[in-house]
């Protein structure tokens, strides 16, 4: 809805992840046969990170080990569930038949893990996730890892994803970084938004990044210039490009 409304001018600004934006501009995936390509990027805001948690007592170390088991994959058609589909498919499995999928949000999903109803919960968003933090605070829980072959296949097949890690100490009992993948969440604009307006919006945000991060630490990546102007799967708005060049970021 956000991308469709941004593209057709119903709204001038919107928020979306880079993977969904790529599908929109290329008329693929959920946007197949639709014309939703009139969007431009203003700036990335934060990253959504793939993460999954299980109880240490499960004996499971890798997401690949959950095949055939009961797994909470997020609400149906949510970002978490779409990424669960992608991950199991990249493993060569037939999703959702390869697991006993439970379509639960992060709170309910983590409760299901806590109660032994699901062996793991999959999430896709910033970290720490509240439900997963609660799970690690109340149970001896661990983050699941990727087998390197699976992770590298995901990165090779989907250029908008990037390798990253969840730092040690993010969750209670997590004593080492956990390698995973993520995607940038973008502020997008209707392609017909005036260059002047786009320029002024980007200028206002970029010149007040420190204040934004002080109010919400999840936005800390915005302080990294390379993160802000790094390669994106959709074009920057010309007004944004003008500001970034004037500021010496491009």
Outline where the language-model segments fall.
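Short, small-residue-biased leader/transition segments that mark boundaries at the very start
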Residues: 1-3
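Extracytoplasmic
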Residues: 8, 36-37, 47-49, 68, ...
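Acidic, polar ligand-binding/catalytic clefts
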Residues: 11-46, 129
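Pocket-lining segment of extracytoplasmic ligand-binding domains
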Residues: 18-20, 28-29, 58, 95-193
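Short, flexible turn/loop "capping" segments at secondary-structure junctions
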Residues: 44-45, 63-65, 177-182
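Bilobed "Venus flytrap"/periplasmic-binding protein-like clamshell domains
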Residues: 47-115, 213, 230, 234-239
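Ligand-binding clefts/hinges and TM-proximal coupling segments of bilobed small-molecule sensing domains
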Residues: 69-86, 160-232
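An extracytoplasmic/periplasmic, membrane-proximal ligand-sensing/linker region
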Residues: 108, 115, 125-143, 150-156, ...
């Amino acid at each position: 809805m956000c991308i469709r409304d941004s593209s057709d001018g119903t709204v001038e600004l919107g928020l979306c992840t880079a993977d969904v934006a790529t599908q929109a501009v290329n008329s693929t995936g959920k946007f197949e046969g639709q014309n939703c390509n009139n969007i431009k990027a203003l700036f990335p805001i934060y990253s959504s990170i793939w993460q999954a948690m299980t109880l240490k007592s499960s004996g499971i170390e890798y997401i690949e080990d959950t095949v055939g088991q009961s797994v909470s994959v997020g609400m149906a058609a949510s970002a978490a569930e779409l990424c669960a589909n992608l991950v199991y498919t990249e493993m060569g499995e037939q999703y959702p038949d390869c697991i006993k999928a439970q379509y639960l949000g992060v709170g309910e999903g983590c409760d299901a893990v806590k109660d032994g109803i699901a062996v793991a919960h999959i999430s896709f968003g910033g970290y720490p996730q509240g439900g997963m933090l609660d799970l690690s605070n109340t149970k001896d829980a661990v983050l699941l890892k990727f087998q390197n072959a699976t992770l590298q296949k995901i990165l090779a097949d989907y250029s908008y994803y990037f390798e990253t890690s969840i730092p040690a100490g993010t969750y209670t009992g997590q004593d080492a970084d956990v390698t995973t993948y993520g995607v940038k969440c973008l502020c997008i604009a209707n392609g017909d938004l005036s260059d002047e307006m786009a320029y002024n919006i980007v200028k206002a945000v970029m010149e007040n990044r420190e204040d934004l991060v002080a109010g919400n630490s999840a936005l800390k990546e915005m302080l990294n210039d390379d993160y802000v102007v790094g390669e994106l799967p959709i074009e920057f708005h010309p007004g944004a490009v003008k500001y970034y060049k004037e500021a010496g970021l491009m």
